[in-house]
């Protein structure tokens, strides 16, 4: 339903936008509800702005019994819109910015009287001004309906609304979201559509629209959340690979119904009692556990990949940057030991900022512990380990199990490094070329075996496993 928006404020000098009419303690009570009750009705409003009427003519009868012209000042506020849809039905739209209240009422009788009151007031002020000052000094601001063209009036309303949106409604409100996000469809003329611009300082797409849209980190285009997972978190506009959660990667890689997680109840206990002036370590752990639904920065377990039993660990960058603490190291070590005992191939998907500083040397020790378990797995048991490096893989993970795979696979354009660019530049006092820590550049230097896009990422390890003697269970049972 297309809705039409009228916003104006009556002042001594001119007719200015200040969002129409509102509640009054001295008059009728809540606008659009003469009974005095307040029943919120949630609805939306379009951002196509028109004048209140196409012809600009109004009747001013049957008004005095509601309120006189002098009483109209008590109705002026910043909080109410007069709205008319394409069917001619009228509404009053009230919202309180501070308390984020949004109400709509469609009492047609009251609104018709309200509309007439405005017309009556404008006509009386214009006529009085004409008599007192004469034709030459007559202020036409008070009679835009009678003398201004429709185009001029629309432009006036557009500029007022545009100014108001930028100056007043910079809050986390569904009203502002709806106005700024709805398309221009339904607008009959260019002059009647409001033009708004949004900058990152007061309008965060990810915060306000996270449940609907995902913003690309590269081109800043919006991807519809409903289809984003089915496209494996790849931007539709530029093809950029956005981060995936560990749960999404498990769903992508593991056959349905075969996932058996390990050590889900293992959590960090702040072993060195790390304290920060900003936020205690335990509070940070609790926060990320609530926001991600995970207990730690890695998920480990046993599953099947195209029918082949495997042991897999998937790191999650959303949990404290995927940092490796004592729990992460212990879970990965136990996974490798389980795979060693059961002669299973291992996949570890890396996405980490490195060792967790809140656990000091205990986090650094995990590098040696995991590497020791991998040495026994690879060298003594002659089993097969595939390392998959995603963006970002840095620090202690790069310096340990990330680069120890029998086959090392990287995602396209993944950021892979030991130290970050700023650290290197500040330490060596040299400028690091752009792209020198990207997967493609490092691949040509011989650091990886493969760069594999996400679409075939499940099939490639499956073929590698079969090449190394790991076959699907149905084929093993077939030959028995």
UniProtKB/Swiss-Prot annotation:
Broad enzyme group: transferase
Cellular component GO terms, alphabetical: acetyl-CoA carboxylase complex; chloroplast stroma
Pfam families: Carboxyl_trans
SUPFAM superfamilies in the record: ClpP/crotonase
Pathway assignment: Lipid metabolism; malonyl-CoA biosynthesis; malonyl-CoA from acetyl-CoA: step 1/1
Ligand binding (Zn(2+)): 216, 219, 235, 238
CoA carboxyltransferase N-terminal domain mapped to chain residues: 212-480
Keyword Glycosyltransferase: no
ZnF start-end (C4-type): 216-238
Gene3D superfamilies: 2-enoyl-CoA Hydratase, Chain A, domain 1
Gene Ontology molecular functions: acetyl-CoA carboxylase activity; ATP binding; carboxyl- or carbamoyltransferase activity; zinc ion binding
InterPro entries in alphabetical order: AcCoA_carboxyl_beta, Acetyl_CoA_COase_Trfase_b_su, ClpP/crotonase-like_dom_sf, COA_CT_N
Biological process per Gene Ontology, one example term: malonyl-CoA biosynthetic process
Stored NCBIfam families: accD
Protein task: Component of the acetyl coenzyme A carboxylase (ACC) complex. Biotin carboxylase (BC) catalyzes the carboxylation of biotin on its carrier protein (BCCP) and then the CO(2) group is transferred by the transcarboxylase to acetyl-CoA to form malonyl-CoA.
Subunit comment: Acetyl-CoA carboxylase is a heterohexamer composed of biotin carboxyl carrier protein, biotin carboxylase and 2 subunits each of ACCase subunit alpha and ACCase plastid-coded subunit beta (accD).
Entries under HAMAP family matching the protein: AcetylCoA_CT_beta
Name of the molecule in the record: Acetyl-coenzyme A carboxylase carboxyl transferase subunit beta, chloroplastic
């Amino acid at each position: 339903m297309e809705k039409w928006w009228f916003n104006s404020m009556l002042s001594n000098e001119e007719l200015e936008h200040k969002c129409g009419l509102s509640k009054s303690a001295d008059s009728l009570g809540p606008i659009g509800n003469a009974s005095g009750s307040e029943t919120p009705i949630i609805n939306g409003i379009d951002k196509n702005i028109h004048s209140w009427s196409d012809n600009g003519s109004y009747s001013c009868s049957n008004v005095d019994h509601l309120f006189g012209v002098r009483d109209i000042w008590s109705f002026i506020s910043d909080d109410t819109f007069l709205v008319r849809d394409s069917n001619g039905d009228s509404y009053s739209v009230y919202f309180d910015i501070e308390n984020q209240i949004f109400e709509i009422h469609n009492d047609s009788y009251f609104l018709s009287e309200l509309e007439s009151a405005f017309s009556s007031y404008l006509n009386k002020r214009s006529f009085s001004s004409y008599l007192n000052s004469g034709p030459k000094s007559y202020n036409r601001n008070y009679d835009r309906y009678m003398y201004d063209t429709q185009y001029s009036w629309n432009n006036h309303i557009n500029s007022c609304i545009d100014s108001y949106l930028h100056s007043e409604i910079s809050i986390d409100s569904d009203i502002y979201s709806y106005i700024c996000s709805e398309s221009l469809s339904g607008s009959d003329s260019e002059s009647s559509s409001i033009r708004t611009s949004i900058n990152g300082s007061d309008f965060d797409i990810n915060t306000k629209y996270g449940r609907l849209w995902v913003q690309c980190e590269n081109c800043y285009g919006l991807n519809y959340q409903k289809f984003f997972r089915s496209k494996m978190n790849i931007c539709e506009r530029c093809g950029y690979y956005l981060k995936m959660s560990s749960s999404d990667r498990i769903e992508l890689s593991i056959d349905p119904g075969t996932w058996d997680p390990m050590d889900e109840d293992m959590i960090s206990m702040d072993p060195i009692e790390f304290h920060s002036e900003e936020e205690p370590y335990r509070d940070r752990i609790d926060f990320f556990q609530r926001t991600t639904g995970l207990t730690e920065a890695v998920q480990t377990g046993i599953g099947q990949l195209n029918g082949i039993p495997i042991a897999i660990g998937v790191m999650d960058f959303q949990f404290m940057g995927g940092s490796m603490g004592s729990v992460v190291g212990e879970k990965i070590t136990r996974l490798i030991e389980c795979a060693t005992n059961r002669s299973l191939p291992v996949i570890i998907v890396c996405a980490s900022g490195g060792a967790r500083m809140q656990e000091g040397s205990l986090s650094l020790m995990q590098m040696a512990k995991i590497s020791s378990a991998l040495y026994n797995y690879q060298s003594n048991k002659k089993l097969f380990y595939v390392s998959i490096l995603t963006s970002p893989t840095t620090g202690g993970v790069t310096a340990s199990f990330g680069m120890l795979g029998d086959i090392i696979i990287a995602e396209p354009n993944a950021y892979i490094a030991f130290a970050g660019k700023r650290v290197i530049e500040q330490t060596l006092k040299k400028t690091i070329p752009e792209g020198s820590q990207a997967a493609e550049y490092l691949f040509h230097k011989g650091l990886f075996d493969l760069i594999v896009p996400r679409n075939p990422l499940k099939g490639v390890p499956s073929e590698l496993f079969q090449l190394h003697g790991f076959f699907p269970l149905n084929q093993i049972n077939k030959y028995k």
